[in-house]
Amino acid sequence: MVTFYGKTFASRLLIGSALYPSPAIMQGAIRAAGSNIVTVSLRRESAGGKTGDAFWNLIRELDVAVLPNTAGCRSVREAVTTAKLARELFGTSWIKLEVIADNDTLQPDVVGLVEAAAILIKDGFEVFPYCTEDLSVASRLVDAGCKVVMPWAAPIGSARGITNRDALKLLRDRLPDITLVVDAGIGAPSHAAQALELGYDAVLLNTAIAKAADPVAMANAFRLGVEAGRTAFEAGLMNARDFASPSTPVVGTPFWHAVS
């Protein structure tokens, strides 16, 4: 079980709703993933039009929690305005906060992100900030009132997996009471498993499932990867070693096997 702002969910896999070949495949993938939380973009769908109504009905049929995002916003003002519109439209105080600084890398504007988070939290929002793996940025977000922090594994859509394991591990070690979600850059179920093995509470992804040859099958694979990673973390992974360590004890080895 994982908790976000006082609400508890069974699945540790959060999934996006964009880029799927069809609405039916999107629904099938979300079901196969077992996800309880789906991200939606206000910029992509407008509930005021026929397309928006149809999309919203599909999401409602899934009986999942909705996490609106501010994807595409490049300023504090734009992100705050989009968040307020999303709250009115979707009826939730949750917001996945994105403030983008660079078009090529889609790297977060960390200064603007912290500023926007502080504004929204004062206005009653429960913020899920998309950030880099920088500890100082994450700490500032926590100081602003965020109870969830979502560092990237790698740039959005890159499918490169965890590129800075040490930094992500440091975040987990230094922020033990904060819900941490790896968001962006996940390309394979093994990447998701690695994040959960580090002690992260969940992962959020979209492209790796939506752009797979078989999104529904891939969603199931990610579900299994997340479950395996969390189970491994709870079981207690052995520490890595620089040198070999025999798995077979030498005590009691027959003398004729001894090395002279």
UniProtKB/Swiss-Prot annotation:
It is an enzyme of class 2 (transferase). 1-deoxy-D-xylulose 5-phosphate binds at residues 157, 184-185, 206-207. It is found in: Cytoplasm. Its EC number is 2.8.1.10. GO terms for molecular function: thiazole synthase activity. Pfam families: ThiG. The active site is at 96 (schiff-base intermediate with dxp). CDD domains: ThiG. One of its GO terms (biological process) is thiamine biosynthetic process. Pathway: Cofactor biosynthesis; thiamine diphosphate biosynthesis. GO terms for cellular component: 2-iminoacetate synthase complex; cytoplasm. InterPro entries: Aldolase_TIM, Thiazole_synthase_ThiG, ThiG. Keywords: Cytoplasm, Schiff base, Thiamine biosynthesis, Transferase. PANTHER family: THIAZOLE SYNTHASE. Belongs to the ThiG family. Catalyzes the rearrangement of 1-deoxy-D-xylulose 5-phosphate (DXP) to produce the thiazole phosphate moiety of thiamine. Sulfur is provided by the thiocarboxylate moiety of the carrier protein ThiS. In vitro, sulfur can be provided by H(2)S. Homotetramer. Forms heterodimers with either ThiH or ThiS. This is Thiazole synthase. It comes from Bradyrhizobium diazoefficiens (strain JCM 10833 / BCRC 13528 / IAM 13628 / NBRC 14792 / USDA 110).
